[in-house]
Amino acid sequence: MKTQWNFEKVKELFDQPFFDILFLAQNIHRKNFNANQIQISTLLSIKTGACPEDCKYCPQSARYKTNIKIEKLLTLKQILKSAQQAKKLGSTRFCMGAAWKNPKERDMHFLKTVIQEVKKLGLETCMTLGTLHNDQADRLAKAGLDFYNHNLDTSKSYYQKIVTTRTYQDRLNTLKKVRKSGMKICSGGILGLGEKLKDRIELLIELSNLEIAPESIPINMLVKVKGTPLENQTSIDTFDFIKTIAITRIMMPTSYIRLSAGRENMNEQTQAMCFLSGANSIFYGCKLLTTPNPKKERDKQLFSKLGLNIKHKNTNLNYSILSDNSLNYTSKIHSQQFYNAETA
């Protein structure tokens, strides 16, 4: 039976002592994953800039002066060259992003070819192309696309302060089409947009209460880019960021949690705490679309220090709800059993 989360349950989690939250998250993580293994993906911008949307965090919006170099859709040869390099570096998934509001019909055949050719390299494929209309999700799935990324970004109530060119329901509708098509969902959010705790809670509830939780959940720390409306936004507290990673793991125990944008500005200790809290995937490479990312040598050094091994093979996940007694422990705050991931 799938856990149905509500605000009170999640708020109670956030109210617990920091180390209690991490302890529970690590136990749940070990129940479902090899805690010393990390999945590597590579993200390539296949069409950059001139996006008509007004997402306040995004340097690719045509509405902001961010000095982003506008690039037209890459050729198949260019994409495959990057995919081959990604595989050589250890990535098991190749993600492709296009700065569109939605894919145009004229590009669908090319996208189909790209998917099929990348898969021939033995890589999983993921695309983020904006809102999907009509039968586009079905056609991408038929072409062999494994994952479709479409982030919710933040809570429904805060969303309108960040994006006005597409609605929250538009995003949810796209996720429904993706799930119905048979593709796996990659969907998460951005922390540090100026949201409150309640917004983080509502975002996690929205994700976890989808018909099936996303198989992949990217958690981003806002990268403040000069020229965007959020360039001077106050940074999220590091402990609040780590705590949110941990509670994401508790709420969605079998999903891969990707520590995504913002790692370039995180020290090794912060990243290590995120991995301890249940993050088990990263993007490999010096750039995420248009924002900086740690160089592979730096990541390799960190993995070596932490004893983390790169996951080379894809395995089927066990989506059963947890029932191990080790996930139950006593909260001194309430003098009663604090949490049972099976019965919540």
From Swiss-Prot:
GO biological process, one term: biotin biosynthetic process
Coiled coil stretches, renumbered: none
CDD domains xref list: Radical_SAM
Pathway the protein acts in: Cofactor biosynthesis; biotin biosynthesis; biotin from 7,8-diaminononanoate: step 2/2
PROSITE patterns xref list: RADICAL_SAM
Catalytic activity, EC: 2.8.1.6
Keyword Phosphoprotein belongs to the record: no
InterPro entries xrefs: Aldolase_TIM (IPR013785), BATS_dom (IPR010722), Biotin_synth/BioAB (IPR002684), Biotin_synthase (IPR024177), Elp3/MiaA/NifB-like_rSAM (IPR006638), rSAM (IPR007197)
Cofactor note: Binds 1 [4Fe-4S] cluster. The cluster is coordinated with 3 cysteines and an exchangeable S-adenosyl-L-methionine.
UniProt-annotated binding residues for [2Fe-2S] cluster: 95, 126, 186, 258
Keywords recorded for this protein, A-Z: 2Fe-2S, 4Fe-4S, Biotin biosynthesis, Iron, Iron-sulfur, Metal-binding, S-adenosyl-L-methionine, Transferase
Reported cofactor(s): [4Fe-4S] cluster; [2Fe-2S] cluster
All residue ranges annotated as the Radical SAM core domain in the record: 36-260
Domain of life: Bacteria
Subunit structure: Homodimer.
Function of the molecule: Catalyzes the conversion of dethiobiotin (DTB) to biotin by the insertion of a sulfur atom into dethiobiotin via a radical-based mechanism.
Protein name (record): Biotin synthase
